[in-house]
């Protein structure tokens, strides 16, 4: 269990997950989470500018009960909880999410342009954007999480940041992290690739294989991004940590430092999953993306890449049959997944429209596979290209892509 406590209540044997405040304020900037087992480290923390830390009570000592009550009473609230937005129908939130994605794309283009020109990152604007994305995920998580997968290869650099932000928020809520940490996770997702602005566009968008020097330049984006975020002095250690460590792997084979297991913070482990999932489900200049179902299957096979507990929570957040996936039912009908069921990952709502046996269209019908008495079930995924289905995305989004993009906000590249 994660708890935020004053440094005055730290004691030896506690596991410090992260430190609150700027990385410039504390002497542990190269570390992820660590067990506080040194009196010297404890003294350095108490003498630093850090006022509060996150501890993980499942990995070390917890607060005494009376101290926990005291901490809850005195700690400031980073983000007011307030009433949760009312959950709305998928169709309604899709329309809202499409507009939000357009605004988010424009905001990220502007933010990345500023970073490329050496200007300060507008973290206040970024935080407001995170709040909007978080509210959309709360109203209906399937809407925004599914819609951001429809970005074009030209939009990837910017919409990838929006997608990872939304995925981090959904995953943080699935892990039942406290609201302040959910917000930090979202901001970390939005800014995790800011260091790519130090990489020239011809390399970022190169359709062929990168040369060794080009690949080396791309691999430096975590350090470049961390420096940018440190320079702006307005983001927490958690956000910088994700930027610096989202390419680390749980088995120690990642980069830039080859960290492993508990050396990698929880949010960085989350960032690794969300970053890879969106990357492999997106069309890139050099590779067409996998469908969401194939991506989940492949990621499950990559032993040593991801924290297993975090990955299981991620699958629960996005679903085994993600919205927009083409599936075959036992009845021989083909349909597109419309919505996940909270009760079971195996019984989504599906819009059927085609007979695989007769190979002809059938009247469209929404089938709730989780309804009592429903005997039909999903038997597998189908590749849409194999059936030459066009406008499949319009079937579940209800949106028409008339300009080549669902998120055309009239913006150009920085």
From Swiss-Prot:
GO terms for biological process: positive regulation of cell motility; regulation of single-species biofilm formation on inanimate substrate. A divalent metal cation 2 binds at residues 193, 221, 246-247. A divalent metal cation 1 binds at residues 160, 192-193. SUPFAM superfamilies: HD-domain/PDEase-like (SSF109604). Phosphodiesterase (PDE) that catalyzes the hydrolysis of cyclic diguanylate (c-di-GMP) to GMP. Hydrolyzes c-di-GMP to GMP in a two-step reaction, via the linear intermediate 5'-phosphoguanylyl(3'->5')guanosine (pGpG). In vitro, can use pGpG as an alternative substrate and hydrolyze it into GMP. Acts in regulation of motility, synthesis of virulence determinants and biofilm architecture. Optimum pH is 8. Pfam families: DUF3391, HD_5. Monomer. PANTHER family: CYCLIC DI-GMP PHOSPHODIESTERASE PA4108, CYCLIC DI-GMP PHOSPHODIESTERASE PA4108-RELATED. Keywords: c-di-GMP, Hydrolase, Metal-binding. This is Cyclic di-GMP phosphodiesterase PA4108. PROSITE patterns: HD_GYP (PS51832). It is an enzyme of class 3 (hydrolase). It comes from Pseudomonas aeruginosa (strain ATCC 15692 / DSM 22644 / CIP 104116 / JCM 14847 / LMG 12228 / 1C / PRS 101 / PAO1). The keyword Isomerase does not apply. The lineage of its organism: Bacteria, Pseudomonadati, Pseudomonadota, Gammaproteobacteria, Pseudomonadales.
